[in-house]
């Protein structure tokens, strides 16, 4: 399925983005990261819209869609990104990842209640597994790594920010699918232009605050490169995500995007091995969350099960 492929690409690029941000916030600040990573959005989305061959779609969106996409820009690109980067700064990618995957619960809940998508026993089991991952990390965090770390994790702060980021990120797929109004990929990319432009306007307004501008000017050239690159890459990730939810159900695409937790382990090992926690609990929690993703996307019809079991698994709610 093309939507599944787009979702998988979104997961990989999003995980790489978080690893790049982690590299930058080791010595830089979250404020510097979000201020420099947001402005690349409009040109990146606009280029994708032009390549889609239907740039005029941006003028065909309803007023409601425009407002929803603008709201997504502020909630996802500004607030969600701030919470996400703050969580990464406090506890690193590997500890923040399973908590951030709770965004899947938000997406599925909204998809069921507002988009009319269905919840099945398999999806319910997947949700339980996804929730179990962060719980395991929280209980085993003291023994998560035997070797000394180059940083001291701030667990309460990190988990709180990761949870808030999950709320913001979880609402986005449902809102994007709602705002595209069934008009396809070009509509989703048009919405991306609007969302990123709204987020950029907010960032420009924040620069009027003297302290914000002063902190931005203090960024080192090396960190500036990491933050700008992460901004460009995260919008590539968003392009894939927007296209995925435009052509496939949220209950399918959102879990696949959750595979970012698997990718982030390898990218973190590559870029910031001394600023992440690698241990049995971290890996086990990620595997459990991944199993939840697999279960959620599984189809009972494709499994060699007795008819009675298939009938039970075929139950839908609501």
Feature locations, PLM:
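Membrane-interface interhelical linkers
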Residues: 1-31, 36-71, 81-91, 139-161, ...
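Extracytoplasmic gate region of multi-pass secondary transporters
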Residues: 169-173, 177, 181, 238
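Structural signature of transmembrane alpha-helices in multi-pass secondary transporters
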Residues: 10, 41, 100-103, 165, ...
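Juxtamembrane helix-start motifs in multi-pass secondary transporters
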Residues: 33-34, 96, 188-192, 253
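C-terminal transmembrane-helix exit sites in multi-pass transporters
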Residues: 105-125, 132-135, 262-284
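Hydrophobic/small/kink-forming positions within alpha-helical transmembrane segments
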Residues: 15, 46, 74-78, 104-109, ...
